[in-house]
């Protein structure tokens, strides 16, 4: 076939595009994905995962971290292997071979061609910086074209150990490298896009050889052909800059970024440079999105060598789910300032995380992050940091802005899942064998003169000075453990464990006192760690924070010790089966505004035909908002062009009304609609609360969620209790502990709109004719700015003149019935005990049937009444739901129809239970106090006992009567409180 002579170098299954390399003409071909090519791509990904070492060379491995794998919780790679990356492998999941640590010496023979280019002629001496920089330049800047040509020829002829031809025939030479025994490698959630390690080098080589990146599409194929070498010519101004610069022109790759990438937006900035979102294009064909970091270097070669430390650290790391994946780097001119000159900049191409960073997410949530999310994030960070430590790298700047949130599609669960990724390796350092094996005298000769990282996340030993004013400690793995503990504390409580740190989410907080903060951190001790009372966190979470924030470094655990604990093993197993998913919100102010929607979930849905193939009008219509006071709360009705803030639309349907198997009374089934669908959005104006909203069309099966409030009262009561919302739990069982997740995802809860109005739940149904003019109000966040909050259904409350607690409104299905049964069963047992206690004063006596059986029957009658009432209510409710569905209207629970039947049933149950309780008390009083004891108690020996003292006839029955009276009061309280 024609494709046999091509080498597959890139495959993006989401975009259904592939890039092939022609070794004869040294050109690149862009083609649509086919079934055969897609199958070959999967084989290449599989081959790449088997042969690639998941840790760097043994010389860079940290000696303090054991290299033996740790089996976590008995998790095997065959049980949901691709669902969550926290599965730790003790055996290769593909070739079924056990790990052999003795084969680690063969890793150097099986590394990729990219690393061969970068590390060609490299020296084993880690202190020889010049040799390392030259080796990096050999790989990155291609100053040695002969070496690159030879390496490319090896790739074409099959010399690369990690390549396979288009027919799937392996061209691997030598012995396949064993699966790396690192316990920190985690299998990917879904099949990642295949990108050859030589792809960007081949692209760069083809660019230098004169590839013309024009639109030459023929039969859905886009071929880059050789052209004249006009593209390599540089303007005279840039030639003068090259001559005056400290960098030779051969180090610069002029026009590479503009030719193959299209810059969209700026997504972040830091001390080293800025990060931009870009799209990789060949002949106008979109091949995916990446993040590129531009670091100005100018003529400062020492600064370039320092920045290259990040590149060196990234290139030694292979693909890991919790680490930002490095792609390529090169030198090129750029203009960092708007009115400044063009200077040489180092471009670092990396993987793009599509859901912002942890700092923005924590600023939105504050201290409301559920513990299930905290533990999932913590496990992700442990695996990422553990992989860095195992690879001989310490990050030295673990903080929320450097932790990115990424969402990927999980083909196993058919939904998106969320995980964290560690980024920004500009301050990282390597842990070489010379540093660990060097004698103490050698270590003392290397003195630390400053600090690297953020003060709030620095370990105390790094700020402690000796008598001579010099720092005592150096950076090691335990510094990252401390930063992880501070990060875990901040996720749990929304603040830092320091007095002078101020608000971590405010850049220039006046309460932040830097000199006092440094002294506080340097003098930190174990007994100074204080946990706030609100929010309440579990003891396990507090214990983990306490262990991580030990003042002495040797008392802190290693990552391998943390992951080997039984508690973390159980958590890892849980999140392997049930990975979390965060709603995709607009918390990232640098959100991608491109018309191309290439997220994995969108592509999968597009293939299924459940959504439209284009959604460019959504982002274009979001710019038509006319006032900044419009809130982000939205409701879904019909298509419109007035989209506000491009937020998620929410709808509520009654198609499944009355089909709840858990006997919930008129449960309203909530559903979620993709934001891609065109929906009409109601504009909420926080300044004018007297605007009127259009009436709800009774012929539609949708309820417009509207936030109501009283103009004279700013109190708004919202039900945030997941345990009291059965409709929400039935729709999303995987996020039952995530209250804020459900609030943002569009599930209906409920609202109180008046000072004297009672609360109605999400299972309540509002009559369309009960209210025509409703006032609206925007719920603002804790910072005072209008945030993205949920629109709640408007329900008109009855004028009862009595305000009840929001969570106690109606009796609901199985849960209420179970509570009644448990209570009355305990009451019956207590009644039996009272009868035996009544007869305990006489020896060899027991309660007579005239005393015991009637009381036991009266105690069990309420159970039968409750079950009968629930069954009748459910039958009437189902009939009423059928009438509602046939008419296409929704009736209020407190109005006519099923709501009235339920309320009448509750009132009847209350009356019956009250009457039965009073009858039981009177009967016990008559039998035990007014009648002789010989009637209420019966002797086992049939011998008339000797009469006891008068105290047993008077005092003891009165005590028993008091106990029964207490039981009556508890019963009445339960009846009126529950009903």
Swiss-Prot record:
The keyword Ribonucleoprotein does not apply. Residues 207-245, 593-666, 713-793 are annotated as: Disordered. It is a multi-pass membrane protein. The keyword Protein transport does not apply. Residues 593-602 have a biased composition (Polar residues). Its main location: membrane. Residues 212-244, 610-666, 728-737, 753-773 have a biased composition (Low complexity). It is found in: Membrane. The chain crosses the membrane at residues 846-866, 912-932, 956-976. This is Probable serine/threonine-protein kinase iksA. It comes from Dictyostelium discoideum.
């Amino acid at each position: 076939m024609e494709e046999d002579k091509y080498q597959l170098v890139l495959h993006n299954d989401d975009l259904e595009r592939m890039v092939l390399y022609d070794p004869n003409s040294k050109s690149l071909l862009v083609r649509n994905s086919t079934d055969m090519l897609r199958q070959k791509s999967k084989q290449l990904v599989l081959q790449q995962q088997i042969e690639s070492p998941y840790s760097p060379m043994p010389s860079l491995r940290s000696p303090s971290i054991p290299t033996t794998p740790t089996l976590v919780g008995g998790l095997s790679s065959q049980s949901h292997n691709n669902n969550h990356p926290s599965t730790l492998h003790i055996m290769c999941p593909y070739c079924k071979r056990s790990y052999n640590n003795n084969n680690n010496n063969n890793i150097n023979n099986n590394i990729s061609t990219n690393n061969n280019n970068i590390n060609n002629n490299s020296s084993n001496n880690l202190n020889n910086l010049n040799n390392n920089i030259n080796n990096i330049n050999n790989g990155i800047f291609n100053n040695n074209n002969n070496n690159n040509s030879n390496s490319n020829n090896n790739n074409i002829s099959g010399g690369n150990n990690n390549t396979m031809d288009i027919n799937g025939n392996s061209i691997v030479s030598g012995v396949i490298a064993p699966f790396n025994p690192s316990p920190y490698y985690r299998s990917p959630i879904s099949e990642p896009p295949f990108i050859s390690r030589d792809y960007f080098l081949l692209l760069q080589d083809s660019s230098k050889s004169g590839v013309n990146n024009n639109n030459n599409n023929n039969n859905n194929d886009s071929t880059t052909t050789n052209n004249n070498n006009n593209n390599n010519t540089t303007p005279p101004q840039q030639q003068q800059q090259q001559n005056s610069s400290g960098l030779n022109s051969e180090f610069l790759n002029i026009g590479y970024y503009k030719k193959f990438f299209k810059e969209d937006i700026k997504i972040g900035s830091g001390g080293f440079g800025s990060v931009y979102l870009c799209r990789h294009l060949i002949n106008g064909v979109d091949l995916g999105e990446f993040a590129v970091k531009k670091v100005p270097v100018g003529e400062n070669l020492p600064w370039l060598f320092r920045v290259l430390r990040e590149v060196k650290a990234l290139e030694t790391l292979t693909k890991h789910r919790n680490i930002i994946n490095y792609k390529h780097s090169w030198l090129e001119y750029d203009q960092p300032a708007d009115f400044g000159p063009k200077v040489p900049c180092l471009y670092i191409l990396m993987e793009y995380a599509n859901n912002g960073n942890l700092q923005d997410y924590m600023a939105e949530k504050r201290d409301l992050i559920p513990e299930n999310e905290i533990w999932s994030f913590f496990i992700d960070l442990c695996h990422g940091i553990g992989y860095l430590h195992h690879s001989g790298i310490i990050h030295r700047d673990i903080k929320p802005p450097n932790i990115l949130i990424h969402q990927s599609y999980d083909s196993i669960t058919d939904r998106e899942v969320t995980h964290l990724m560690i980024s920004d390796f500009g301050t990282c350092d390597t842990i070489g064998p010379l540093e660990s094996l060097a004698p103490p005298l050698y270590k003392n000769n290397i003195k630390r003169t400053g600090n690297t990282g953020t003060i709030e996340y620095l370990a105390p030993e790094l700020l402690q000075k000796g008598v001579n004013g010099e720092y005592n400690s150096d950076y090691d793995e335990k510094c990252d453990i401390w930063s992880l503990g501070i990060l875990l504390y901040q996720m749990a409580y929304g603040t830092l464990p320091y007095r002078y740190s101020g608000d971590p989410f405010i850049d220039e907080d006046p309460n932040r006192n830097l000199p006092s903060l440094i002294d506080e951190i340097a003098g930190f001790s174990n007994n100074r760690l204080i946990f706030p009372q609100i929010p309440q966190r579990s003891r396990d979470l507090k214990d983990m924070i306490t262990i991580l924030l030990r003042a002495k470094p040797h008392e802190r655990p290693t990552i391998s010790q943390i992951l080997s604990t039984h508690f973390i093993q159980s958590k890892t197993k849980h999140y392997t089966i049930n990975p979390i998913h965060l709603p995709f919100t607009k918390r990232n102010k640098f959100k991608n505004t491109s018309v191309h929607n290439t997220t994995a979930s969108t592509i999968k849905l597009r293939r299924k035909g459940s959504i439209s193939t284009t959604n460019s009008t959504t982002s274009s219509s979001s710019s038509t908002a006319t006032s900044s006071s419009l809130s982000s709360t939205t409701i879904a009705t019909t298509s419109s062009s007035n989209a506000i803030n491009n937020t998620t639309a929410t709808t509520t349907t009654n198609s499944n009304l009355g089909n709840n198997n858990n006997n919930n009374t008129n449960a309203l089934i909530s559903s979620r609609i993709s934001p891609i669908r065109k929906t009409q959005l109601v504009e909420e104006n926080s300044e004018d609360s007297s605007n009127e909203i259009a009436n709800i069309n009774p012929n539609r099966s949708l309820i417009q969620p509207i936030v109501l409030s009283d103009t004279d009262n700013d109190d708004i009561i919202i039900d945030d209790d997941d345990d009291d919302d059965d409709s929400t739990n039935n729709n999303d069982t995987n996020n039952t502990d995530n209250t804020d997740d459900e609030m943002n995802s569009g599930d209906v809860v409920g609202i109180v709109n008046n000072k004297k109005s009672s609360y109605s739940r999400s299972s309540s149904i509002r009559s369309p004719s009960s209210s025509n003019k409703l006032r609206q109000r925007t719920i603002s966040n804790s910072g005072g700015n209008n945030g993205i909050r949920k629109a709640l259904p408007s329900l008109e409350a009855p004028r009862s003149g009595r305000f009840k607690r929001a969570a106690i409104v109606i009796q609901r299905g199985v849960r209420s019935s179970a509570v009644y049964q448990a209570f009355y069963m305990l009451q019956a047992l207590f009644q039996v005990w009272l009868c035996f206690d009544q007869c305990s004063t006489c020896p060899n006596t027991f309660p007579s049937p005239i005393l015991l059986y009637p009381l036991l029957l009266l105690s069990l009658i309420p159970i039968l009444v409750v079950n009968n009432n629930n069954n009748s209510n459910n039958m009437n409710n189902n009939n009423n739901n059928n009438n509602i569905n046939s008419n296409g209207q929704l009736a209020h629970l407190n109005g006519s129809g099923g709501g009235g039947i339920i309320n009448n049933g509750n009132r009847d149950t209350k009356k019956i239970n009250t009457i039965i309780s009073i009858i039981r008390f009177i009967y016990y009083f008559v039998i035990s106090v007014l009648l002789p004891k010989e009637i209420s108690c019966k002797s086992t020996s049939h011998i008339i006992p000797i009469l006891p003292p008068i105290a047993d006839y008077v005092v003891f029955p009165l005590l028993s009567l008091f106990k029964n009276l207490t039981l009556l009061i508890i019963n009445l309280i339960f009846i009126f409180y529950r009903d």
